[in-house]
A protein has these predicted regions:
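Beta-rich carbohydrate-recognition and catalytic domains
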Residues: 1-23, 27-89, 98-148, 152-210, ...
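Structural signature of WD-repeat beta-propeller blades
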Residues: 92, 147, 216, 285, ...
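C-terminal structured domain segments
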Residues: 280, 594-595, 599
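Electrostatic interaction modules used in gene-expression and signaling proteins
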Residues: 287-289, 602-604
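Short Gly/charged-rich anion-binding patches and loops
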Residues: 532
Length: 640
């Protein structure tokens, strides 16, 4: 998704000299008045003695600040303070909408201390000029938060969105419509509505263990009402994840969901989102549109106010695009292209994860084969058109030769796994995972191109280990060119994709791959748990394409890609927001390891990219994508 944090972040910070906003200033919501932008925000005071609480507590007021540009704010002052008994312990999290020349400011009103669900309700302040408050009302007679009006009437009615039962889950994000303004604070109206509130809920929750809450007041676009909301994954777990998502509702019938994001567009990554009163929080609270850009305001770690910018046009195109129409890797119609052969003991159990290289107008595959007794070796196959296998070896072309790829216990697996092939000069380098039943490490060997083409497999060089001792390291690929006189090697220690530069390919005791963390997992996404490079990068006029596999929290393997700068490939230009390939076919969903697509090879032939992958750790499949279509995806998913 196209989103970038403001370099001025955090745009709103506590002021120690203002006791009422000395602890935190967050969850800001903007309102436009003339040429100025006013920001309403929650302000937390220094601890002080509260007569009604009979205790030293911190309290919340709602502040207001002014700006000419949306990120530099001045003239900060209190705006909404606890005055009524239904808000006597604090006013929190404002959401402001201008309707009929008045500013309707909904906020969380706290009436009880210690805080409890039946004392947490929605309050409303109405202002004509953002200087003074003309009216205040208690809105909901039940536990609710995060209410906001739509900025215009729909079918002659006033509409609003709110979160019901935020403090006694499950929470519902609901819609409500009013015939007249006074209905907004009518207790009778709300009691009738509340009796069947669940029928007014939007189905946004994916899992019963997740938590949702309204974020921004609705934004009108030509395609629909756009609302950003908080989606908290695994809310009741210590590993909960705060994310920001979005939904697009029909302009005339807001109950109709036109589109929504599949993954969070923002999670806590920056220090001001990770460190605060409540760590690791991003919480959307307000937005406006200017010059085709969405200015999205959010709270960071319940401490500061922040701003992110989103390209409106591209964002809407992305969430509205039908997944079936979006370019993806297209499987060969005759998949799987390689199966295990029961007559060959060395590949009887499975064939999978092929490396690929294009030489002399043929695609050459070196694939992993697993024997009955769980020893992995490499087989060979070739194709003249990239789609169909013309010939396949009857014997393994590479076997475990060194102690670091042989087992000392017959009850564990071992061998040579997951080959990747790169041609540099007149040599083909093959990196693979060497496994002795204890620690998987990266091994490197090579063979002369002529020997490879002549299938003189005895010419493979003696393999060497290039990853550190006692460190789990896998998924190694080498760039086919040097950069400033150095080789660039991609590998994986832990969960992210790493890189290492080396002046040469001579490794051994005292010289191992370095771990420079590079491409990270994206929390809440399809690649949230673990990443690994798939195939050696492909050079194009727009940059290097590096395919990778990503694993989700429910252990599904999918395929994505990044576009890297031609001269400085450490610089990531773009990353696919959606998977290019995911387990859908029976041979990908069921096997030795279910729900796996795992490429180790990719080649470009006449403007088309061929990707070769293992399916469910048992068979081999192929898929293609037009190079220009993939580059267009990268253009959409451009990173800032």
């Amino acid at each position: 998704m196209i989103i970038k944090r403001s370099p001025q972040n955090p745009i709103l910070k506590p002021l120690r000299e203002h006791g009422w906003e000395a602890e935190a200033t967050f969850n800001p919501c903007p309102a436009i008045k003339g040429k100025d932008i006013f920001l309403l925000y929650r302000a937390i005071s220094m601890p002080h003695y509260h007569n009604l609480a009979r205790n030293n507590i911190i309290t919340s007021d709602i502040g207001i600040a002014q700006s000419k540009n949306g990120y530099n704010f001045f003239n900060r002052k209190k705006f909404i303070i606890p005055e009524k008994n239904w808000e006597q312990f604090g006013c929190e999290d404002p959401r402001v909408t201008k309707l009929n020349d008045k500013y309707f400011i909904f906020y969380t009103a706290l009436s009880k201390y210690p805080f409890q669900a039946d004392g947490i309700k929605v309050g409303l302040a109405i202002s004509k000029d953002l200087k003074n408050i003309q009216e205040k009302h208690l809105v909901t007679p039940f536990n609710a938060k995060a209410m906001a009006l739509f900025p215009e009437k729909i079918n002659g009615q006033i509409w609003a969105i709110l979160s019901v039962h935020t403090d006694k889950p499950p929470t519902k994000i609901c819609l409500v419509s009013f015939n007249k303004e006074s209905d907004i604070w009518s207790e009778k109206f709300w009691n009738n509505w509340y009796a069947n509130f669940e029928k007014y809920a939007l189905p946004l929750q994916r899992n019963k263990n997740d938590f949702i809450e309204v974020g921004t007041p609705p934004l009108k676009t030509k395609y629909g009402w756009l609302i950003f909301y908080s989606y908290i994954y695994n809310y009741f777990s210590p590993n909960r994840l705060f994310g920001i998502e979005a939904v697009l509702l029909d302009l005339k019938n807001p109950f109709k969901i036109l589109a929504r994001t599949e993954y969070p567009i923002l999670t806590a990554e920056e220090y001001y989102e990770k460190i605060g009163l409540v760590p690791n929080v991003v919480f959307p609270s307000g937005a406006f549109i200017k010059n085709d850009w969405i200015y999205l305001y959010y709270g960071g770690a319940d401490m500061v106010g922040c701003l992110a910018l989103i390209n409106l046009r591209i964002f809407l195109e992305e969430i509205l695009k039908n997944d079936e129409k979006k370019p993806k890797l297209e499987r060969f119609s005759h998949n799987p292209i390689l199966l295990s052969r029961q007559e060959n003991s060395w590949e009887k159990k499975a064939v999978l994860n092929p490396g690929a290289i294009y030489l002399n107008n043929k695609v050459h595959l070196i694939y992993r084969a697993i024997s009955e007794d769980d020893v992995s070796t490499f087989g060979y196959a070739q194709s003249s058109n990239g789609y169909h296998i013309d010939w396949r070896s009857d014997q393994p072309v590479y076997i475990p030769r060194e102690s670091f790829e042989k087992r000392d216990n017959p009850n564990v697996s071992c061998g040579c796994e997951d080959p990747r092939l790169t041609k540099i000069g007149n040599k083909i380098y093959m990196g693979y995972t060497a496994y002795d039943g204890h620690i998987p490490r990266i091994a490197l060997t090579s063979i002369n191109v002529k020997s490879f083409l002549n299938q003189q497999w005895q010419d493979w060089a003696k393999p060497i280990l290039i990853s550190p001792t006692d460190l789990n390291d896998k998924d190694m690929v080498i760039f086919p060119e040097k950069f400033q006189g150095q080789y660039l090697i991609v590998h994986r220690v832990g969960y992210d994709i790493d890189y290492s530069f080396s002046k040469n390919l001579n490794f051994g005791e005292g010289k191992w791959l370095e771990e420079n963390r590079w491409i990270y997992c994206r929390p809440g996404w399809w690649d949230s748990k673990k990443l690994g490079a798939a195939a050696p990068p492909i050079k194009t006029k727009k940059g290097w394409i590096l395919f990778y596999h990503g694993i989700s929290e429910n252990n599904v393997y999918r395929v994505g890609a990044v576009l890297l700068d031609l001269k400085n490939p450490i610089k990531i230009l773009s990353r696919t927001s959606k998977p290019l390939l995911e387990p859908e076919m029976p041979y990908e969903k069921e096997g030795l390891v279910n729900n796996v697509v795992f490429p180790c090879g990719a080649v470009e032939i006449n403007g088309k990219i061929f990707v070769y992958y293992g399916g469910a750790d048992q068979v081999i499949g192929g898929a293609t994508i037009d190079l220009n279509k993939l580059l267009q995806i990268f253009k959409t998913d451009k990173m800032y």
